[in-house]
Amino acid sequence: MTALTPPQHEAELLQRAKSIAGLTFAELAEELNLVVPPDLKRDKGWVGMLIETALGATAGSKAEQDFSHLGIELKTIPVNQQGYPLETTFVSLAPLAQNSGVTWHSSHVRYKLSKVLWIPIEGERQIPLAERHVGVPILWQPSSSQEQRLRQDWEELMDYIVLGKLTEITARIGEVLQLRPKGANSRALTKGIGKNGEIIDTLPLGFYLRKEFTAEILHDFLMD
């Protein structure tokens, strides 16, 4: 099995995802002629790349959904032995400038979360990378109450950005979404709005889903 062509429809994508559930990273990598790194210190995106390759993801840019022709975003989610998420989930970069007129309905966060294929993966560090397993896929769309909670957080956080209150933003704001610096290092600056409306240099910020929210998604699936 080499890199696959993009799935033509949702059922085909889900079938592919189910077919790799239960495999170890080593088994899946061997099928795809990929080499498993010893760890993720230098290859942070390797697991995502492995799953994307196996499923035939197409997004050349992070701005698009991974399966944009199907309207589906792909997210791997590292979990512990109890199935609880081990980390927050990156959604998209926040628009720190040129953001007038942006609404929840036209936002990148809503676009990215409109339909998500979650792939839980074993993430505990004591398990060697090659021996970690791929989990059962979950195809998810936010319920009306989940979307309402996402929207409330997004609107509150965007108010901070638009009103030039970047220095007041902390990871504690938001019930299900949070804003955190997103960049390889503190030298990777971008343009934002200062408190007097001036353009300033600032750290890029990303929207992240809190672990409690993704845990709820996984729990709801298991209860079905």
Swiss-Prot record:
Its main location: cytoplasm. SMART domains: MutH. CDD domains: MutH-like. One of its GO terms (molecular function) is DNA binding. Keywords: Cytoplasm, DNA damage, DNA repair, Endonuclease, Hydrolase, Nuclease. GO terms for cellular component: cytoplasm. It is found in: Cytoplasm. One of its GO terms (biological process) is DNA modification. NCBIfam families: mutH_TIGR, PRK05070.1. Belongs to the MutH family. Sequence-specific endonuclease that cleaves unmethylated GATC sequences. It is involved in DNA mismatch repair. This is DNA mismatch repair protein MutH. It comes from Histophilus somni (strain 2336) (Haemophilus somnus). The gene is mutH.
